[in-house]
Curated annotation (Swiss-Prot):
Its EC number is 4.2.3.20. This is Sesquiterpene synthase 1. GO terms for biological process: diterpenoid biosynthetic process; limonene biosynthetic process; sesquiterpene biosynthetic process. It comes from the Eukaryota. Keywords: Lyase, Magnesium, Metal-binding, Mitochondrion, Transit peptide. One of its GO terms (cellular component) is mitochondrion. A motif (DDXXD motif) lies at residues 348-352. It comes from Toona sinensis. Binds 3 Mg(2+) or Mn(2+) ions per subunit. CDD domains: Terpene_cyclase_plant_C1 (cd00684). Mg(2+) 3 binds at D492, T496, E500. The keyword Glycosyltransferase does not apply.
Amino acid sequence: MASHVLASLRSASARISTRLQSRSCILATATSFSNGFVSASLVQSMSTTTQCDESVARRSANYEPPIWTYDYVQSLRNPYAGGSYAKRIEKLKGDVRVMLQKLVDLDPLHQLEFIDTLQRLGVSYHYQEGIKGILDTVYNNYMQKQESLYAVALGFRLFRQHGYHIPADIFSSFRDDKGNLKSCLGDDCRGILALYEAAHLLVEEERDIFYEIVNFTTAYLKEYVKHDNDEYLSALVNHSLEIPLHWRVLRLEARWFIGAYERAPNTHPILLEFAKLDFNDVQATHQEDLKFMSRWWKNTGLDREKMNFARDRIVQNVLWSLGIIFEPQFAYCRRMSVKAYAFITLIDDVYDVYGTLDELELFTDAVDRWDATAIEKLPDYMKPIFRTLYTSINDMALDARKDRGVDTRPFLHKAWSTLFNYYLMEAKWFSNGYMPTYKEYMDIAWFSVGGPVMIVHSYCAIANPATKENMEFFQEYYDIIRLWSTILRFKDDMGTSSDELKRGDNPKSIQCYMHESGVSEKEARQHLGNLITETWMKVNKNRAENPHLSDVYMGIAINMARMALCMYQFGDGHAVEAHSKDRVLSLLINPIPCP
């Protein structure tokens, strides 16, 4: 990855200098790399002043204080945690395992339907080995024996989701003599819905098939719900048309589908009760994560009381963490990830809004050097930020060395150093009133959105996969990381750019594309929406081409893209808490009522 970062920083600086026709507009950038780290000498003259000059005119984003207070968070209690409920959960878990084992006596379609139900209810993580065994057994002959559109489409989606090779031409039997999808398929809403969901597992070489299927199925499904023929099926259709299943956050899908499954015509009461109790049990774990991280954040002194210019969004950061990896056994990973998200949120506001260019250069240099003594040259308000970041990263690396004998510090440091060098480049653009080209912007913005840092933190915090060899993924598989993070960047820009422009921030991808292409904002947003779809197809391809990569790692990365669609679906759900309030309530606050 280092070579890509080096080339990007150099080329971006060169292009800016040329287009502004003034070397004084952009500070000369001399970039060097040492031991795989980004080490950029971006400061021409470094001030030694340590005080924050109160006479400096500073911008303000006027962020609202958090709606979830510290005392409220600490008061959270889950009535379904532990006690008799824990025993009941274990009993039901065993009952469902028996049900899964008895699937061998049923036809393959029923087996796949049961697996799909387990996944959507959010309990499949308990039965991964059994599910894989069923899929291995069914895979070889399933497609050849199925004739219905529903059965073929369901199998296509599940097998591709789990890494099995299924060619797209299995849908050829549903075409007429002219090669078009048969009009008679319109009599099968369940099959059409399954086909719509299956299409979102197609890859970029299957782009034409994707658009044909999605256009055909979307038109039919929109017409179907107008007539409301079947309440349960119509609910599924509306849900899918909002966001396809493959793009949905797993825990939010579980919460929604548990309610939908309760109204389904063939609900299994044991499975429903288990899903409810298990959801509440996992939610209790996430509440403990929230309380722990809320205490940590308050103890750092970096919260709203001290850093009133920045977003204080620890609850949203916890929401991000559970959206990316929710399973109870990964509590340490979630907590370390929340630290990363909290630092990204705070320091992004320092670079975007509060800091002067001189201060930002000092901070970037301090992180590049990764030396505790560098703190002495920082202004006072930056010192606790650097100190807490420095201590947290080193402590996390020490944990990994003690527990697994792996030195993760180089990977963590490189990610943060790269991020802040890109933040600094964007700050220089703003300082000089420079409008980057769309390419210049995206060459930096895919990383400056924080996605790669989020991924590397999560991965370094997981016990089993984090070996030195696997950590080198971040150099060898640079393009894959860029794809996932690009989805995050596009959704972030679509959700936040209007608010950020109002307070005078840098232009985002929408504005860069509008300026370069001469299109309207509506057209630019449509273009980015299309690019998100195209990027998902590339993600699907990379996932299929790299089956040797850890399922846990791949899950973290793809779930980050899913969380981006969720958090920025209705605007900026990270900065504006009202946009994410319902999701916080459903995943972190309110359990599902149980008898």
